[in-house]
Each structure stands twice: as structure tokens, then as C-alpha cells.
């Protein structure tokens, strides 16, 4: 019996001899490189403010733990807060909220409690948000 090493990455299933996930990742990264994000301001005080907001906002995390939160901010002030057990889903909820409400991403900051994956960074770029924390 032949053993094949199979791994998962942020873009799906990757097999060593046939790596469509890698090709897809390269194509996606190349597409994102050409995106021009607006210049944005970030102040240290806003980072402290966002951290305070996300850590004290009434949430499932405070009740149960093991929940990822994302807050969309403008100049450190929360505009939208979402939670999900999946950190990618929390980002997707922000994207959906922005779409439904016609929110201009140019002056926004996305702050997330989850560790950042390549896919989350790419999603943020595609959303047009210039700052990801």
C-alpha cells in the first residue's frame, strides 16, 4: 500500500504530487497584490480603545469562551461587532454586514481576536479595508 502525505492549508486540500491548492493560493495572492488600498491612519490610542471595546463588549465569549470576535471600527470606535466559533466566519459576517449596509471600507479598521491566516488577510484586502489588526 502506498502512503501519500496529505495536508490542509488555508486554501484547501494539498497533496504533494498534485497541488491545486498551491496553484490556487499563488493565483489568489497575485490577484490581491494588484489591489490598491486607500491610505489610512492608525493611532496607538485607537488600538487600546479597540482592545478595550472587544474585551468588554457583552458577548458569547464572556459567557462561554472559545468564540472569535471581530469588530469593524472607524477611528477606534466600533461600527459593527460579530462573533463566531470560526474566526473566518466572524470575518465573513463583517463582510456581509458591510455589503448589506453599503459601508465604505476606506476609513475602517478590522480588529479580530483570532490569529490571522492568509485567507483572512486576503478577505480583508478584497473587502477594501486598509488596516487589519
Predicted stretch roles:
Residues 1-69, 73-75, 80-81:
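Intrinsically disordered, low-complexity regions enriched in acidic/Ser/Thr/Pro/Gln residues
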Residues 6, 22, 54, 67, ...:
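Weak global preference for isoleucine
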Residues 21-34, 72, 85-90, 96-97, ...:
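Generic alpha-helical propensity signal that fires on short helical segments
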Residues 43-46, 50-53, 66, 87-90, ...:
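General structural feature for long, well-ordered alpha-helical segments within catalytic domains
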Residues 61-114:
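Glycine- and Gly-Pro-enriched alpha-helical subdomains that act as flexible
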Residues 101-133:
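Extracellular/luminal Protease-associated
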Amino acid at each position: 500500500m502506498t502512503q501519500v502525505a496529505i495536508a490542509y492549508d488555508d486554501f484547501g486540500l494539498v497533496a504533494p504530487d498534485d497541488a491545486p491548492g498551491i496553484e490556487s493560493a499563488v493565483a489568489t495572492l497575485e490577484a490581491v497584490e494588484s489591489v490598491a488600498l486607500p491610505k489610512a491612519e492608525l493611532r496607538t490610542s485607537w488600538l487600546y480603545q479597540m482592545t478595550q471595546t472587544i474585551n468588554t463588549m457583552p458577548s458569547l465569549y464572556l459567557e462561554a469562551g472559545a468564540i472569535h470576535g471581530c469588530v469593524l471600527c472607524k477611528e477606534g470606535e466600533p461600527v459593527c461587532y460579530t462573533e463566531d466559533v470560526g474566526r473566518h466566519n466572524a470575518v465573513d459576517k463583517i463582510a456581509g454586514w458591510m455589503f448589506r449596509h453599503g459601508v465604505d471600507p476606506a476609513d475602517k479598521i478590522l480588529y479580530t481576536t483570532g490569529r490571522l491566516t492568509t485567507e483572512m488577510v486576503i478577505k480583508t484586502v478584497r473587502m477594501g479595508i486598509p488596516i487589519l489588526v
